[in-house]
C-alpha cells in the first residue's frame, strides 16, 4: 500500500511573506530613495549669487581734538556728561572727539552750524565711507541668502539704534520707548546671526564670520546698555550714540576690506 503523504498548509505563511516583503521595501526606500535632512543640505547645488552691496558712510560731528589718547578720553568724558557720544577716533597724528554720527554730510553740517551759533563751538565734520561693491558669492543658495540677510540686518539695526538715540533727544520717545526699540533690534540681530551661523556651519567663510562677529558685538552692546540700572535718558542717549558710531565704523571697515579683496 502506498503511503499517503499529507501536506499541512500553514495559514499564516502568506501573511508572513507579505510582512517580510514590506520590510524589505521599506529598507530600500530608506537607504536608496530618501535622504536625511543633513544629507539633503550637503547635496544642495553650488550656485553663483550676485551680491550688490550699497555704499555705506557716516559723517561725524567733531567737537574737539587732542594730541594724545589720554587727553582725548578726558575731553570725551566731558561731552558724555552732556549727552554726546564722546567717541575717540584716531586720525592722522591726532585724536578726534566725536559728539554724534549721521548718515549724510548735509545733516552733520547742519548740526555743526547749529553748535557754532548756539554754543560758539568750533566743530567740524569728518566722514568715513565704504564704496558700493559688487560681489559674486559661490556656494549654496541658503548660505548666500543668510549672508546677504545678515549684512542687511546689521545695516538696518545700526540705523535703528541711531534713530532711537535722536528720537530720545527730541522727546519723541521716553527712556522706556528707547529700551523697547533696543530690545527689538537686538532680537533681529540675534535672529540674523543665528541664521547665518546655521547656514555656514561646517563651511568656514571669512565674510560670514566677520558679519556674524559684528552682529554678536551689536547684541553685546545692546545687552550692556539694557542692563544699566538707573540710567538717565541723557546717559542712555550718549551710550546709544557711542555704539551707533562704533558699530557703523566697524561695518564700514569690513566693507572696505571686502572691496580691497575684490
Task: Give names to the regions the model predicted.
Residues 1-8:
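N-terminal Lys/Arg-rich, disordered targeting/topogenic segments
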Residues 8-17, 255-261:
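Intrinsically disordered, low-complexity regulatory regions
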Residues 12-32:
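Hydrophobic membrane-insertion alpha-helices, especially the h-region
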Residues 38-139:
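Solvent-exposed beta-strand motifs enriched in subsets of small alpha/beta binding domains
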Residues 114-181:
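Charged, amphipathic alpha-helical linkers/stalks
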Residues 161-175, 192-203, 222-235:
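Secondary-structure edge/capping motif, primarily at the C-terminal ends of alpha-helices
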Residues 182-215:
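Mature extracytoplasmic domains of secretory-pathway proteins
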Residues 202-262:
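Extracytoplasmic/luminal low-complexity segments enriched in Pro/Gly and acidic/polar residues
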Amino acid at each position: 500500500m502506498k503511503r499517503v503523504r499529507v501536506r499541512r498548509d500553514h495559514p499564516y505563511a502568506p501573511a508572513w511573506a507579505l510582512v517580510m516583503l514590506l520590510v524589505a521595501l521599506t529598507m530600500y526606500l530608506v537607504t536608496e530613495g530618501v535622504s536625511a535632512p543633513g544629507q539633503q543640505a550637503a547635496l544642495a547645488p553650488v550656485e553663483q549669487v550676485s551680491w550688490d552691496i550699497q555704499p555705506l558712510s557716516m559723517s561725524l560731528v567733531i567737537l574737539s581734538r587732542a594730541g594724545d589718547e589720554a587727553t582725548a578720553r578726558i575731553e570725551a568724558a566731558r561731552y558724555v556728561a552732556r549727552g554726546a557720544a564722546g567717541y575717540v577716533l584716531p586720525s592722522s597724528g591726532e585724536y578726534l572727539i566725536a559728539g554724534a554720527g549721521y548718515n549724510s554730510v548735509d545733516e552733520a553740517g547742519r548740526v555743526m552750524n547749529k553748535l557754532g551759533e548756539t554754543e560758539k563751538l568750533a566743530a567740524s565734520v569728518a566722514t568715513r565711507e565704504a564704496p558700493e561693491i559688487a560681489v559674486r558669492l559661490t556656494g549654496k543658495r541658503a548660505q548666500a541668502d543668510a549672508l546677504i540677510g545678515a549684512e542687511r540686518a546689521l545695516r538696518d539695526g545700526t540705523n535703528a539704534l541711531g534713530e532711537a538715540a535722536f528720537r530720545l533727544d527730541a522727546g519723541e520717545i521716553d527712556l522706556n520707548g528707547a529700551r523697547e526699540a533696543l530690545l527689538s533690534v537686538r532680537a533681529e540681530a540675534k535672529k540674523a546671526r543665528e541664521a547665518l551661523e546655521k547656514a555656514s556651519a561646517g563651511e568656514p567663510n571669512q565674510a560670514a564670520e566677520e558679519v556674524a562677529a559684528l552682529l554678536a558685538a551689536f547684541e553685546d552692546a545692546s545687552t550692556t546698555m539694557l542692563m544699566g540700572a538707573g540710567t538717565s535718558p541723557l546717559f542712555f542717549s550718549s551710550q546709544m550714540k557711542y555704539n551707533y558710531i562704533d558699530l557703523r565704523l566697524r561695518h564700514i571697515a569690513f566693507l572696505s576690506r571686502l572691496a580691497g579683496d575684490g
